[in-house]
Amino acid sequence: MSKSALVILAPGAEEMEFIIAADVLRRAGIKVTVAGLNGGEAVKCSRDVQILPDTSLAQVASDKFDVVVLPGGLGGSNAMGESSLVGDLLRSQESGGGLIAAICAAPTVLAKHGVASGKSLTSYPSMKPQLVNNYSYVDDKTVVKDGNLITSRGPGTAYEFALKIAEELAGKEKVQEVAKGLLVAYN
């Protein structure tokens, strides 16, 4: 049975982080569901690119996924942080031992919903003050994995972030194959 990923798409999401995560995971053979936070209509991202989700988050919130991916972008992260549905989903994912992945500003969503407290993580540098009290903050790594949590810093680290998620779900050999096809170095 193939692994599955839920990528939440919220208004103001960082396009690169969203696209790279969804694309890399699909290339690795993972079944990716893109769910719009506010429904199934097109979502305007941080640089005014509009993306059409597969479905609404409400439609799939009770489904089980191997990973829940939170792309960054300040607007998208704020919207996810204010969503009780996202909070319930993340707490369920955490209690069930599922993987959670957050990049850029999205680790603040974890803090707002009380998820993964005490774990090591990283984020976009300006988000650090919102995270240092509840997490072990890592400044010197572009991707941090602590148990079932994967975090990363921003748009420039999106490939490494996505490949790390893919490695967890599809294995090192498959990820090396995907990285090679993308002309991206990955160890």
Curated annotation (Swiss-Prot):
Tissue spec. comment: Expressed in the head and testis (at protein level). Ubiquitously expressed at constant levels.
GO MF annotations, alphabetized: peroxiredoxin activity; protein deglycase activity
Phenotype reported upon loss of the gene: Viable and fertile. Larvae develop normally but show increased oxidative stress-induced cell death. Larvae show structurally normal neuromuscular junctions, however they fail to show structural synaptic plasticity in response to oxygen species (ROS) levels. Adult flies show severe defects in locomotor ability without loss of dopaminergic neurons and increased sensitivity to oxidative stress. Results in altered subcellular localization of Daxx. Does not show more elevated levels of methylglyoxal adducts than controls.
CDD domains per record: GATase1_DJ-1
InterPro entries per record: Class_I_gatase-like, DJ-1, DJ-1/PfpI, Prot/Nucl_acid_deglycase
One GO location term (cellular component): cytoplasm
Coiled-coil region: none
PTM info: Oxidation of Cys-45 and Cys-104 in response to oxidative stress. Levels of oxidation increase with age.
Record carries keyword Mitochondrion: yes
Gene3D superfamilies given in the database record: 3.40.50.880
Lyase is among the record's keywords: no
Function: Plays an important role in cell protection against oxidative stress and cell death by acting as a oxidative stress sensor. Does not play a role in methylglyoxal detoxification. Plays a role in mitochondrial function together with Pink1. In motor neurons regulates structural synaptic plasticity of locomotor behavior as part of the PTEN-phosphatidylinositol 3-kinase pathway in response to oxygen species (ROS) levels.
Protein name, as recorded: Protein dj-1beta
Organism placement in taxonomy: Eukaryota, Metazoa, Ecdysozoa, Arthropoda, Hexapoda
